[in-house]
Amino acid sequence: MGKKLVMAQRRGETRALCLGVAMVVGAVITYYILGTTVLPLYQKSVWTQESTCHLIETNIRDQEELEGKRVPQYPCLWVNVSSVGRWAVLYHTEDTRDQNHQCSYIPSSLDNYQVARADVEKVRARFHENQDFFCFSTTRENETSVLYRRLYGPQSLLFSLFWPTFLLTGGLLIIVMVKINQSLSILAAQR
């Protein structure tokens, strides 16, 4: 019976070690992928200065064309704010600024014009309710645009790194526990 117990224990230890090593390898692969995709975007982001913006005006433009999409026209919200003592155009995210310089907010549903228009009206009403809000600006002197929300900020970087770190820590803990168990088994067998 003792030999069967030792064999079962070895099989279980081998499986646990394989699980721990697989978790560590998975975490390393995930770190590599995040290091080549998310980290460069975070490092390139110039929108680091948090400031308070005050709403000057909002305008809905109906005849906008989005490059690369099959949508002929869609409503777009254009927002002017004052930030850090200067006039600026507010953009929802970095991607909004890259998609169309004329739009502060591009609705998510572009298939139905009425739904998109209602979405833009809702966002416009929120801006009029809260005329002072936090925004992100750059330290460049001649920049006339600010962001409402950063896509590639420290929070998104930490959120992206949470699960791989959890996976790496769990895998290392499993490996350490198996090795401690093996060394304690050897010590017990020697007595």
Curated annotation (Swiss-Prot):
Encoding gene (name): KCNMB1
Location relative to the cell: Membrane
Keyword terms, alphabetized: Glycoprotein, Ion channel, Ion transport, Membrane, Transmembrane, Transmembrane helix, Transport
TM spans (from-to): 19-39, 158-178
Signal peptide: none
Cytoplasmic face residues: 2-18, 179-191
Oligomeric form and interacting partners: Interacts with KCNMA1 tetramer. There are probably 4 molecules of KCMNB1 per KCNMA1 tetramer.
Gene Ontology CC terms, in alphabetical order: voltage-gated potassium channel complex
Pfam families linked: CaKB
Family: Belongs to the KCNMB (TC 8.A.14.1) family. KCNMB1 subfamily.
Protein modification: N-glycosylated.
InterPro entries membership: K_chnl_Ca-activ_BK_bsu
GO BP: any one term: detection of calcium ion
Extracellular-facing ranges: 40-157
Stated role: Regulatory subunit of the calcium activated potassium KCNMA1 (maxiK) channel. Modulates the calcium sensitivity and gating kinetics of KCNMA1, thereby contributing to KCNMA1 channel diversity. Increases the apparent Ca(2+)/voltage sensitivity of the KCNMA1 channel. It also modifies KCNMA1 channel kinetics and alters its pharmacological properties. It slows down the activation and the deactivation kinetics of the channel. Acts as a negative regulator of smooth muscle contraction by enhancing the calcium sensitivity to KCNMA1.
Molecular function, one GO term: potassium channel regulator activity
Name under which the protein is recorded: Calcium-activated potassium channel subunit beta-1
Native source organism of the sequence: Bos taurus (Bovine)
